[in-house]
């Protein structure tokens, strides 16, 4: 299972990549493996305001529907429309092709409250 060291992680299994003044968000390799084959992804519109720890969308797999939670607060500036036609990217490439949204954070320092790769790995190994 892949847990890239340069990313930050939420306890709800979202990953965060800081890219200058924006933040790219997706779900982790662990999350996609637990969900099974992803068949549908529901994401917010560009311009939507997100609040940290509040739902912003969902992923549907053959097993279940799981909500996505915003790891930090901010405004959605990009949505990965590729996932509409290719939800399987979430299983195949969770950290690259399957990024979900890009936000302009309300406060970039919120990223510091997220888990490091090491902390995330410890958390999932406790479950």
Swiss-Prot record:
Bound cofactor: record note: Binds 1 lipoyl cofactor covalently.
Record carries keyword Secreted: no
A GO BP entry: glycine decarboxylation via glycine cleavage system
Cofactor(s) the record lists: (R)-lipoate
Every Lipoyl-binding domain range: 22-104
Gene3D superfamilies assigned: 2.40.50.100
Pfam families: GCV_H
One GO cellular component term noted in the UniProt record for this chain: cytosol
InterPro entries assigned to the protein according to its UniProt record, in alphabetical order: 2-oxoA_DH_lipoyl-BS (IPR003016), Biotin_lipoyl (IPR000089), GCV_H (IPR002930), GCV_H/Fam206 (IPR033753), GCV_H_sub (IPR017453), Single_hybrid_motif (IPR011053)
Positions of post-translational N6-lipoyllysine modification: 63
Keyword list, A-Z: Lipoyl
UniProt keyword NADP present: no
Function recorded in the entry: The glycine cleavage system catalyzes the degradation of glycine. The H protein shuttles the methylamine group of glycine from the P protein to the T protein.
Family: Belongs to the GcvH family.
PANTHER family hit by this protein: GLYCINE CLEAVAGE SYSTEM H PROTEIN (PTHR11715), GLYCINE CLEAVAGE SYSTEM H PROTEIN-RELATED (PTHR11715:SF3)
Subunit structure: The glycine cleavage system is composed of four proteins: P, T, L and H.
Protein name as catalogued: Glycine cleavage system H protein
Species of provenance: Anoxybacillus flavithermus (strain DSM 21510 / WK1)
Lineage: Bacteria, Bacillati, Bacillota, Bacilli, Bacillales
């Amino acid at each position: 299972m892949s847990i890239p060291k340069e990313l930050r992680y939420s306890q709800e299994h979202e990953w965060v990549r800081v890219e200058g003044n924006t933040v790219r968000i997706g779900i982790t390799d662990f999350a996609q493996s637990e969900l099974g084959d992803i068949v549908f992804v529901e994401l917010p519109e560009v311009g939507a305001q997100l609040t940290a720890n509040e739902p912003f969308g969902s992923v549907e797999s053959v097993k279940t529907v799981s909500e996505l939670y915003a790891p930090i607060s901010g405004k959605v500036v990009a949505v990965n429309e590729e996932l509409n036609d290719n939800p399987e990217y979430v299983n195949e490439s969770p950290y690259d092709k399957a990024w979900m949204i890009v936000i302009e954070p309300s406060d970039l320092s919120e990223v510091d409250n997220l888990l490091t790769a090491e902390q995330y790995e410890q958390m999932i190994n406790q479950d």
